[in-house]
From Swiss-Prot:
GO terms for molecular function: acetylcholine receptor inhibitor activity; ion channel regulator activity; toxin activity. Keywords: Acetylcholine receptor inhibiting toxin, Disulfide bond, Ion channel impairing toxin, Neurotoxin, Postsynaptic neurotoxin, Secreted, Toxin. Belongs to the three-finger toxin family. Short-chain subfamily. Type I alpha-neurotoxin sub-subfamily. InterPro entries: Snake_toxin-like_sf (IPR045860). Its main location: secreted. Binds to muscle nicotinic acetylcholine receptor (nAChR) and inhibit acetylcholine from binding to the receptor, thereby impairing neuromuscular transmission. Disulfide bonds join 3-24. GO terms for cellular component: extracellular region. This is Frontoxin VI. It is found in: Secreted. It comes from the Eukaryota. Expressed by the venom gland.
Amino acid sequence: LICYNDHGYTGKTTETCENGETTCYEKSR
């Protein structure tokens, strides 16, 4: 997953997103 927060991309790719990272997208590639 690619983690995003209210400000945009967090720069992290993890299996789970932390609290406050409200939107997660599956990696497209």
